[in-house]
Amino acid sequence: MRLDKYLAETAQCTRGEAKTMLAKGRVQVNGAVCKKGDTQLKETDTVAVDGAPLRYQKFVYLMLNKPEGVVSASTDKRDTTVVDLVGDAYPRRELFPAGRLDKTSTGFVLLTDDGGFAHDILSPRHHVSKTYTVTIDTPLTQEMRTGFAAGVTLADGTALSPAEVTALSPDGCTVRVVLRQGVYHQIKRMFGVYGAGVNALHREAIGGLALDAQLAPGQWRELSDEEVAKITR
């Protein structure tokens, strides 16, 4: 890869800005100042700007703790979106949420610009689980447990894949639900089959990766390569 292209992708700048940095001697390759944008980099080369090492990222993967009232979209004319919460941190990346949470729901949203990865975690063929803590307005029953395990048939006739539901609170109104498919308003509609309403829904994990407990609502951070791998493991 050319050095100027590498700079544009890793330092989040334009080719023109990269050219200026090079001309001013701010860029080092393997510890030596380099001013030539057409320099071809090898995989083993290290690049720094003003002495700070850069890390090449073909794609970006972010964990965001979605607060209530924010919509799971890239853009929206009326409401704040999950991408809005990232601000201008990645001006040259076209981030989008891999999957959605309802406006009133909270928890783990994965933001990325990797369309192939997003497809993999959303496709029912890959069986990537999503784990939720759900508050319902009536205690969990054995009928619900049995129905979820067998696969609920929704009111419109849609037959769902088996899901897991377990009680978390003594009164049976706080439960954990694990899904391996995604249907519009799925959890609310599943409980609705049994006459139960959903008061709150919080996504705790995607695949084998749990939401970072240190992230307050609205906060986000990058995922490491190891964390990304946990999602589909």
Protein language model regions, located:
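Basic, flexible Lys/Arg- and Gly-enriched helix-loop patches that mediate nucleic-acid binding at interfaces
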Residues: 1-233
